[in-house]
Amino acid sequence: MNVKFKAHLFIFSLFFCYNLSAQEIVKGDFKNENPQSSYVPSFDMDATDKPVKNVILMIGDGMGLAHICSGMYANQGQLTITNLKTCGFVRTQSANKFTTDSAASGTAYSTGKKTKNGALGMDENNQVIPNLPEKLSGYGYISGIVTTDNLDGATPAAFFAHQPERGMSKEIWADLPNSKLTFFSAGSYELFEKQAPNVQKEIKKEFTIIEEPNDKAIKKSKKLGYLPTKSKTASVNENRGDFLPSTTQMAIDYLSSRSTNGFFLMVEGARIDKSAHSN
């Protein structure tokens, strides 16, 4: 069997197995007696001419096929992602490294351009690249981000900041007031309080900042920043609860109520990567 044929056989097998899991719940002797429910889309809008109004980009930070399979088997053979009809693969190499990082990959998603590892919203020559929220604002769309990482984490920062190095936390926070975000939620309020007084002041000029969901404050605000305490964005194993789904719903409701044109929302599950680093 030659190498080329082996490669084609592998790709065929991969897609065959994925399509099988997308159509049927995997059977087996599972130990988890309390699985999370999964969602099966209706696919009613497939192949229709109706224009897309809202776009939600969901990023599992550091997630690959091993994580999807592990999650599926740990959840009695079912996940929402494996209920989808199609899958795709991308090359993740950055402009200067074979192995990318969250800054370069986040920038690739937010701008459509490859860059060097560590760069946020900038190219290899440290020139600013417009991100999706900035581009979409010119067409009347509003944008938001939700993450279980800190706000200055590389993935969320790639959607609003322009800095040459991901470790420039103070500068990343200082970019927030001039961003095109209408909603953001990330960790944490404690981190926000550590920023320079002038940066806090500028952020509060642009955003209503809340530590807990507050209907009155939410209703009155023009732009909203939900910065919960650090424990709210911790690992699920550390009793995070339903923070991510409930905050995602909050973001959808908030953005929907403030734009008739539509919105873009990036949602990141950051703890996949953090757990994989320790595995």
Regions found by a protein language model. Give the residues of each.
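Sec/Tat signal peptide C-region and signal peptidase I cleavage site
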Residues: 18-22
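Active-site His/acidic residue clusters
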Residues: 154-159, 231-235, 259-262, 266-279
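Bacterial N-terminal signal peptides
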Residues: 9-17
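Phosphate/oxyanion-binding active-site loops and adjacent basic polyanion-contact surfaces
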Residues: 165, 240-248
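Bacterial N-terminal signal peptides that target proteins for export
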Residues: 1-9
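The substrate-binding groove and active-site-proximal loops of carbohydrate-active enzymes
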Residues: 120, 235-240
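N-terminal catalytic scaffold of extracellular/periplasmic and nuclease hydrolases
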Residues: 23-193, 201-216, 223
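Active-site regions of oxyanion-processing enzymes, predominantly non-cytosolic
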Residues: 212, 217-227, 247-270
